[in-house]
Amino acid sequence: MINRSAGFDFENIYTEMVGKYNNATFVEVGCFEGGSTVYMAELIKKSGKNIKFYAVDLFENYRPTNGQVSPSYKKFKQNTLRFAKYITVLKMDSVVASRQFADKSIDFVFLDADHTYKKVKRDIECWMPKVKDSGTLAGHDYTESSFFPGVYFPGVSRAVKGAGFDFNVDKSSWIKK
């Protein structure tokens, strides 16, 4: 069983996206050990919809911040094995992965990778053009203070606020309007 409780509070966003889109392309940037990836794959499987789902993460060479633990590709593969046919893994840097997609070709992108200001800003800049006009760009760990005990990522909040778009906040996730 995969422990999704540690910071996974965006089930409603994933559920809404699967309900909203058909014949779609989804990208999750930052997968850690696959808890949210499996959740999305389960939703896609149950929906019976034609949704291409890409999971983007370096899995290695990651410098954790705020006490985060470096993700393990081996653990990710173990956790996602039974849903492998629903997940295309892009084991690479987020910027490199974004170049694999044409502009305005993706229905839903969820950013939850490096939480430093510079990297979140870069991810928004790289992935925003890839999202269709009717699509959704969102991300995790938007907090003004410690949402979970001892967890606060000011870089995420600063990058999202500075991105120049309106957004809503749902628990600790941000969603571009």
Residue map of PLM features:
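S-adenosylmethionine/decaboxylated-SAM
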Residues: 4-177
